[in-house]
């Protein structure tokens, strides 16, 4: 079986609230760490989320 191109990643909030999103990314085309601005429901505003490993 072939190796899958998409991998699951965890987007951790930089606000320090402990909130995270789980999403997928193409590991072949996006080789650098993903940084996205998304809504943090704990802080109730948009903050940056940085990519981390799923434990």
From Swiss-Prot:
Domain of life: Bacteria
Listed GO MF terms: structural constituent of ribosome
GO BP, sorted A to Z: translation
Xref: InterPro entries: Ribosomal_bL33 (IPR001705), Ribosomal_bL33_CS (IPR018264), Ribosomal_bL33_sf (IPR038584), Ribosomal_zn-bd (IPR011332)
Sorted UniProt keywords: Ribonucleoprotein, Ribosomal protein
GO CC term, one of those recorded: cytosolic large ribosomal subunit
Family annotation (Gene3D superfamilies): Ribosomal protein L33
Family: Belongs to the bacterial ribosomal protein bL33 family.
Full protein name: Large ribosomal subunit protein bL33
Organism: Cereibacter sphaeroides (strain ATCC 17023 / DSM 158 / JCM 6121 / CCUG 31486 / LMG 2827 / NBRC 12203 / NCIMB 8253 / ATH 2.4.1.)
Name of the gene encoding the protein in the UniProt record: rpmG
